[in-house]
């Protein structure tokens, strides 16, 4: 079972595998399961039919008929991850089936009780998170084939058709593009420990290339995702019930708590990738941004959060480079920071196209329902998007070191 959220004791040399991070797939769960034991057939029968059930306004009726199942037959970590993804997806569909104007405010006990139990076992919140939608939600059509869009499929889906498929799978490719960067990060930490300038330079160069590959992977969003479908159809199913005007008091998890609970919706900030790069490069964000970013770490698998916490207390790359003086490593460090700033600028452009511009078009067409207008200027995670993203980018660029430092 996955370790809980406290940071592990930092051991050297740093090892990705110790934090359930794959040498081949990074934070992606390698070869996710697609089926649960037969006992959980009622869950999977609903989860695998979500687009049809939601579009035909039948999901809530199916959930109300769903039996209360015991979670003890979920034996493995991978089964727990699939169960969490299935129950999370059913929950999002159940809450938002009728759009933001008529959210369901009470989650039935047959869904709420097992969902909360599985969530506690995994150290995750009982809501759809990045590790559900992306890290656990992919499979290869040809197991021997490459990890690329044409050979990938999602396991669980929502309304949105090919655009939703593209949104999820392009994000899978973004996670995969980060793998060489994660390896470089570990190599760089060891180089600092060994005082090896040559190895550190090689690691920084590889990190820069990985960040640039992430930007190129993200650019595929424009090829596979229609902005109007993302905004008007998909986005509501990623929305949470914290800092959301459509659900100001939260969601009641029947049989778990009498008071409503509040959880943030999906957010790119729930991906551990840029958190890891920020920690390694020593990039410090403003107080408001740090508060949100660190809260999003509670929405990550605990071992991934522990990895970030251990990076934070590891020897400082910036201090090492500053102590070493001007040279190739300082130049390579700055190139990594610049590449990360460019990635964040590109992400701002993507957000502007898929949310800001799409919201304007939806208003001009008079689409008041089902477009999530209460969320127009906020991310599905509950942040004021553009101001947050621009602040994060600005603080990234402020990390550049003067060659004469």
UniProtKB/Swiss-Prot annotation:
InterPro entries: Indolamine_dOase (IPR000898), Trp/Indoleamine_2_3_dOase-like (IPR037217). Expressed mainly in antigen-presenting immune cells, liver, kidney, brain, and placenta. Highly expressed in kidney, followed by epididymis and liver (at protein level). Detected in the tails of the spermatozoa in the testis and in the kidney tubules (at protein level). Constitutively expressed in brain. Its cofactor is heme. Pathway: Amino-acid degradation; L-tryptophan degradation via kynurenine pathway; L-kynurenine from L-tryptophan: step 1/2. One of its GO terms (biological process) is immune system process. It is an enzyme of class 1 (oxidoreductase). Heme binds at residue 347. Keywords: Dioxygenase, Heme, Immunity, Iron, Metal-binding, Oxidoreductase, Tryptophan catabolism. Its EC number is 1.13.11.-. Gene3D superfamilies: 1.20.58.480. SUPFAM superfamilies: Indolic compounds 2,3-dioxygenase-like. Belongs to the indoleamine 2,3-dioxygenase family. This is Indoleamine 2,3-dioxygenase 2. It comes from Mus musculus (Mouse). The lineage of its organism: Eukaryota, Metazoa, Chordata, Craniata, Vertebrata. The gene is Ido2.
């Amino acid at each position: 079972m996955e370790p809980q959220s406290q940071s592990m004791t930092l051991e050297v040399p740093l090892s990705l595998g110790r934090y359930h991070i794959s040498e081949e797939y990074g934070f992606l769960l390698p070869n996710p399961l697609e089926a649960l034991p037969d006992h959980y057939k009622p869950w999977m029968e609903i989860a695998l039919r979500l687009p049809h059930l939601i579009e035909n306004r039948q999901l809530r009726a199916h959930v109300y008929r769903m039996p209360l199942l015991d979670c003890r037959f979920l034996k493995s970590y991978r089964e727990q991850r699939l169960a969490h993804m299935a129950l999370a997806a059913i929950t999002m569909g159940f809450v938002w089936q009728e759009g933001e104007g008529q959210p369901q405010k009470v989650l039935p006990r047959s869904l709420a009780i097992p969902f909360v139990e599985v969530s506690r076992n995994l150290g995750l919140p009982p809501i759809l998170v990045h590790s559900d939608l992306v890290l656990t939600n992919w499979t290869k059509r040809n197991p021997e084939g490459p990890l690329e869009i044409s050979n990938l499929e999602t396991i669980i889906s929502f309304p949105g058709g090919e655009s939703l498929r593209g949104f999820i799978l392009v994000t899978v490719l973004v996670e995969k593009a980060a793998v060489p960067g994660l390896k470089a990060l570990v190599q760089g930490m060891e180089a600092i420990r060994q005082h090896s300038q040559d190895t550190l330079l090689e690691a920084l160069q590889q990190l820069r290339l990985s960040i640039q590959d992430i930007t190129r992977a993200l650019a595929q969003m424009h090829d596979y995702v229609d902005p109007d479908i993302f905004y008007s159809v998909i986005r509501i199913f990623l929305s949470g019930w914290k800092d959301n005007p459509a659900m100001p008091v939260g969601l009641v998890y029947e049989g778990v708590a009498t008071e409503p609970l509040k959880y943030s919706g999906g957010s790119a900030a729930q991906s551990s990738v840029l958190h890891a790069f920020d920690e390694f490069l020593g990039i410090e964000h403003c107080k408001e941004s740090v508060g949100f970013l660190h809260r999003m770490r509670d929405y990550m698998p605990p071992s991934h959060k522990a990895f970030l916490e251990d990076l934070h207390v590891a020897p400082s790359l910036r201090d090492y480079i500053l102590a070493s003086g001007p040279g190739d490593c300082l130049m390579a460090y700055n190139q990594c920071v610049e590449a990360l700033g460019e990635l964040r600028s590109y992400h701002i452009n993507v957000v502007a196209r898929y949310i800001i511009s799409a919201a304007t078009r939806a208003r001009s067409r008079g689409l008041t329902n089902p477009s999530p207008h209460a969320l127009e200027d906020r991310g599905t995670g509950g942040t004021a998007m553009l101001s947050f993203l621009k602040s994060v980018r600005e603080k990234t660029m402020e990390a550049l070191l003067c060659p004469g430092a």
